[in-house]
């Protein structure tokens, strides 16, 4: 009987563990931020960066994404509660075509790739040092559907009344 209980427990753990979602950007990565990589000292290092997409630019052989960096949750999803944090910006380029209609401004993205230098670009009139990422993985997070909040009004505090008294 104890063997049956143990076997049932093992099967339950395996079934429930199978429900866990593992994204292609999961794993352990060094805590290097785009702001730290602006100096160029982090070139060649494998990192996981993410944030809010500012712009996607398809080119002949690759698509480059300009991103406002945010801290990431453990699963790699950008932490939207920290939009005011100063993680900096970065440009991630990945081989192939990524449709700007799907990869639209405001979407959450996470990249895994190698730091590949610093690229100067203008933000308004300011020259900004964008760390450049050679992305091996591009992950577009699914949109979260938020249901509108509804409320129920109880008359008489929910007690009494109604058709039965």
Language model: regions and residue ranges:
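Sec-dependent bacterial lipoprotein signal peptides
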Residues: 1-19
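OB-fold and OB-like single-stranded nucleic-acid-recognition modules
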Residues: 19-165
């Amino acid at each position: 009987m104890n063997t049956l209980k143990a076997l049932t427990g093992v099967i339950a753990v395996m079934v429930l563990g199978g429900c866990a979602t593992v994204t292609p950007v999961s794993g352990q990565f060094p805590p290097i931020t785009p702001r730290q990589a602006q100096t160029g000292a982090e070139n060649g290092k494998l990192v996981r960066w993410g944030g809010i997409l500012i712009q996607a630019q398809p080119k002949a052989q690759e698509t480059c994404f300009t991103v406002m960096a945010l801290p990431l949750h453990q699963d790699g999803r950008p932490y939207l509660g920290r939009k005011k944090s100063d993680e900096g910006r970065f440009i991630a380029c990945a081989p192939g075509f990524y449709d700007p209609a799907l990869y639209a401004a405001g979407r959450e993205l996470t990249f895994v790739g190698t730091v590949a230098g610093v690229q100067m670009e203008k933000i308004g009139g300011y020259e900004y040092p964008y760390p450049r990422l050679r992305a091996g993985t591009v992950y577009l997070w699914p949109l979260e559907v938020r249901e509108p909040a509804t409320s129920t009004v109880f008359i008489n505090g929910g007690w009494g009344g109604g058709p039965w008294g």
